[in-house]
């Protein structure tokens, strides 16, 4: 089969599309980015946001399958696709970088967020060893990993494995206790720790969490040829 992939509203690596690509390549299909000058047996279209314009042109394919929050919250990947290692070549992702989730869902019910309606309460999803698949840098897109005991166990495993991570959706600063701060200070972060700050009322919580983590020795160290130029 000739498979086309179309991301409507984002250039950011789309995990679902990468897994779909892996699945079809594994069964011998040809997979490529959709080209309107070509014809396809099937085209997968992904849309992240409900407020962005849809693809408005004719799709030259026998079958068209649309997915993503931009089209609705009910459709999910088939289990045999969901557990595939993503096809990182689709986006020319660095060979040492992986993307994924450790948990899905969130216990909060923020009025602006679709996650609870789409994924429900927080549940275990994948192990960091599965997600990283031997890669040393991992972008984790969990919505509230600190709200899960499983998530905290996974952070401990991240530390023991020595992988570098970025929870790019932000951590919930309100959940940072003394013990969690000590744990987070041991993680090898890609550039920085991110905290979600969706309302002005959360600024104080972010400052409190930052101070706690700083207490346990988390710092950024810029190394230059001269020891005198090293700064925190």
Q: Where are these predicted regions, by residue range?
A:
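Short, charged, surface-exposed secondary-structure boundary motifs
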Residues: 43, 55, 73-79, 111, ...
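A short, structured N-terminal alpha-helical element that caps or precedes a catalytic domain
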Residues: 1-66, 71-73
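Core AdoMet radical
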Residues: 5-6, 44-48, 114-209, 220-224
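Ser/Thr/Gly-rich flexible loops in soluble cytosolic domains mediating phosphotransfer, phosphorylation
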Residues: 64-88
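N-terminal pre-triad scaffold of radical SAM enzymes
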Residues: 3-13, 86-120, 135-142
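Surface-exposed amphipathic alpha-helices with a cationic face
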Residues: 57-60, 114, 210-217
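Acidic/glycine-enriched edge-of-secondary-structure segments
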Residues: 7-29, 109-113, 166-169, 194-200
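Single conserved hydrophobic/aromatic residue that forms the stacking wall/gate
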Residues: 222-232
């Amino acid at each position: 089969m000739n498979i086309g992939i179309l991301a409507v509203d984002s250039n950011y690596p789309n995990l679902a599309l990468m897994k779909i690509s892996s699945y079809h390549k594994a069964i011998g299909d040809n997979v490529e980015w959709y080209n309107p000058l070509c014809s396809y047996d099937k085209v997968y279209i992904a849309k992240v946001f409900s407020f962005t314009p849809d693809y408005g042109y004719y799709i030259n394919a026998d079958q068209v399958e649309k997915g993503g929050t931009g089209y609705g919250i009910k459709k999910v990947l088939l289990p045999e696709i969901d557990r595939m290692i993503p096809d990182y070549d689709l986006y020319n992702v660095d060979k040492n970088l992986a993307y994924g989730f450790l948990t899905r869902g969130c216990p909060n019910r923020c009025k602006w967020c679709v996650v609870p309606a789409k994924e429900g309460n927080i549940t275990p999803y994948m192990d960091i060893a599965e997600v990283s698949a031997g890669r040393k840098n991992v972008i984790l897109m969990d919505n509230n990993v600190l709200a899960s005991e499983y998530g905290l166990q996974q952070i401990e495993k991240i530390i023991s494995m020595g992988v570098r991570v970025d929870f790019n959706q932000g951590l919930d600063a309100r959940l940072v206790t003394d013990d969690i701060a000590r744990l987070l200070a041991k993680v090898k972060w890609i550039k920085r720790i991110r905290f979600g700050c969706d309302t002005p009322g959360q600024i104080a919580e972010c400052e409190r969490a930052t101070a706690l983590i700083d207490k346990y020795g988390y710092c950024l160290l810029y190394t230059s040829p001269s020891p005198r130029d090293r700064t925190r």
